[in-house]
Amino acid sequence: MINKGKGWRLATVAAALMMAGSAWATEYSASFKNADIEEFINTVGKNLSKTIIIEPSVRGKINVRSYDLLNEEQYYQFFLSVLDVYGFAVVPMDNGVLKVVRSKDAKTSAIPVVDETNPGIGDEMVTRVVPVRNVSVRELAPLLRQLNDNAGGGNVVHYDPSNVLLITGRAAVVNRLVEVVRRVDKAGDQEVDIIKLKYASAGEMVRLVTNLNKDGNSQGGNTSLLLAPKVVADERTNSVVVSGEPKARARIIQMVRQLDRDLQSQGNTRVFYLKYGKAKDMVEVLKGVSSSIEADKKGGGTATTAGGGASIGGGKLAISADETTNALVITAQPDVMAELEQVVAKLDIRRAQVLVEAIIVEIADGDGLNLGVQWANTNGGGTQFTNAGPGIGSVAIAAKDYKDNGTTTGLAKLAENFNGMAAGFYQGNWAMLVTALSTNTKSDILSTPSIVTMDNKEASFNVGQEVPVQTGTQNSTSGDTTFSTIERKTVGTKLVVTPQINEGDSVLLTIEQEVSSVGKQATGTDGLGPTFDTRTVKNAVLVKSGETVVLGGLMDEQTKEEVSKVPLLGDIPVLGYLFRSTSNNTSKRNLMVFIRPTILRDANVYSGISSNKYTLFRAQQLDAVAQEGYATSPDRQVLPEYGQDVTMSPEAQKQIELMKTHQQATADGVQPFVQGNK
C-alpha cells in the first residue's frame, strides 16, 4: 500500500503474496490523501514502468482511496478514472509514452482511432468512425451531442457526403453512443406515391404542403423528422411525388386532391384601376412578365399575350386593357395573380416630373457705311459700281423709258430695292449718280422658354411664325401669267428635351434647342428672298436639380471693307473719290444658352413652382395697369391671386345674374320682367 500525507509517505507496491510461477500476477492497492496530482502521476508511472509527460497546465490536489487490490489493467483504468474526475485525460503516443493533458484539449490531440474489433474500454480517449445507412447524420448528430461528455473532451461531427459520424470521447461513452446509433439506424416503411395534377402547379403545391408540414411540426406535432413525409415536385410532368410512412402519405395525398381543383368557377378574374400608369402601355410590360412566369412554372403550361389565352399550371392567363376606364383586366390562377398584382403595384406609381428652363441671351451690334460715285456718257462709256446701290446703267435705262414712253415701272423697281440716298446730275452728254448709306443695327434678344415633362418622356415647345419663301416660278401655257411656288419656313424658339432622373437628384438631359429669326432681305432683282438667322444647340448634359449650367455659346466679330474703283483714277488723292465706291461693315455678336432643370417629385413642389410663375405674370399685369392709369377701371382684366377663381368683368357678372333670375322665375311659373336700356 502507498500512502502520502503530513510529510511522510508509505508506499507498498509489492504483491501481498509472492509465489513462484507465472500463474500469480502483481496486484496494487492505492490510497492518496490531499496528494499533489503530479506526485500521483509519477507514482503510477513508476509502478507501471510507463514514461509519462505532464502538461504544464496540469495542477491540483487529489483525494482517492482504493480498498481492493487491483491488477495491472485495473490499476491503469483506476488511474484514467481519477484523471477524468479531475478534468484530465491520457493520450498515448506511438512510442509508448503517455501524455497527460486537459480533457478539453484531448480531442485535438493524437488520440487513437478505434473500430469494431478494438473499441477501447473505460476512460481512455478514443475516436470512432460510425457509418449510418438509414438516417441522416445531419439530423442524428445533434441528438448524440446531448448524450456525449462535451465538457470533458467529447465531440460528435457529421460528414454528409459519406453519411458517417465521427465520435470522440471516453471509450465507455463512445461505445454507448455507437449502440444508440445502431438502434436508431433502422430502415422504415418508405413507399412512394405519384399524384398527377390537373389544375394546380406542382411547384406551388409542394411549397404549400411543405409549409403546412413545417408549421404542424413546429407547433407541437409528434411526427419525427424520419417519419415525416417527403414531398417533391416533378415539373416536367406536373406531378407531386410523396414518400413516407402510410398514414403520413395518406394525409398528404388527401390534401393535394382537395387543393388540385379548377378555380375558374370560383372567380379568378380581377380588375385593376390604375392611378398613374396607362393601361394600354402596362399590358405590354405584363407580356414580358408572363414569359418569366412561364419559365418558372414550365411544368404547368405556357404564358399568354394580351387578350389571348394559354395555360399556366392548368389554368388560363389573360391580360387586357380597358382604355375608357384606364383599367387592367387579368384572369389567372391565384399564385400567378399575386405575382402580377405585385408588378402592377410597383409600376403604377406617381412618376417624378422635370421643369426645364432655358435662357437664350443674344446681343448683336453692327455698323455700315456705303459711298459711291458713278459716271455715264450718252455716246457710250462710263463707270458703274453695284456695291453701294443700283448701277447707273439701270437708272439710265429706267429714266430713258420714262422719258420716251412715260413708263415708271423701271424706276419703281429700282426704288423698291434701294436703301439710303441717291442723287443724279447730268450736263450735256454726261451724267453722274451719287449714292450714300449709313447703317447702325443693335439687337438684344432674351428668350426664356420653359416646359414641364415626365421622367423619360420627350417634350417639345415651339413658339414662332411661318415665313413664306419663294422656291420657284412657272409660266402659264399662254405665257402671260407667272405662278410662284411658295414654301413656308417656321422661325422662332424651339425646345425639345428628354429628361432622365438619376440617383442623387441629378438629371440627364437630351436637349435640342433652336432659336431662328428672319435676317436681312435680299436686294436686287434676283428674287432670292430673305435670309434666316439660326442658332441651334443639340447635346446631352448631366445637371443637378436646381443648378444652372451653360450649354454653349458664340462670340463673333466680323469686319468687312470693300472698295470698287477705276484703275489709276481711283487712286488720285481727293479726286479719286469721284471714281470709286466704298463699303465698310462691322458686326459683333455674343450668344449664350443656359439650362436649368428642377425635379418635381410631388404635388406641393409642382404647386409652388406654378405659384411663382403665376405671381410673376400677375405682377407684370399690375405694373402695366399702373403705368397705363387703369388701376380703377372695371373693364381692365387682371389675373386674380393664385388659387382664387378668375374674376369676370362686371358685364359678364350682370348677364349671369340675369340668367339665374330667368331660370328661377321659369321654375316658379312666373315670367320675369327685364327692363332693357333705352
UniProtKB/Swiss-Prot annotation:
Keyword Signal tagged: yes
Record keywords, A-Z: Cell outer membrane, Membrane, Protein transport, Signal, Transmembrane, Transmembrane beta strand, Transport
Region (Secretin): 353-602
Compartments, record wording: Cell outer membrane
Site (May serve as a pivot that allows opening of the central gate for substrate egress): G464
Gene Ontology cellular component annotations, sorted alphabetically: cell outer membrane; type II protein secretion system complex
Alphabetical list of InterPro entries matching this protein: Bact_Secretion_Sys_Channel, GspD-like_N0, GspD/PilQ, NolW-like, NolW-like_sf, T2SS/T3SS_dom, T2SS_GspD, T2SS_GspD_CS
Keyword presence, Signal: yes
Family: Belongs to the bacterial secretin family. GSP D subfamily.
Name the record gives this protein: Secretin ExeD
Source species: Aeromonas hydrophila
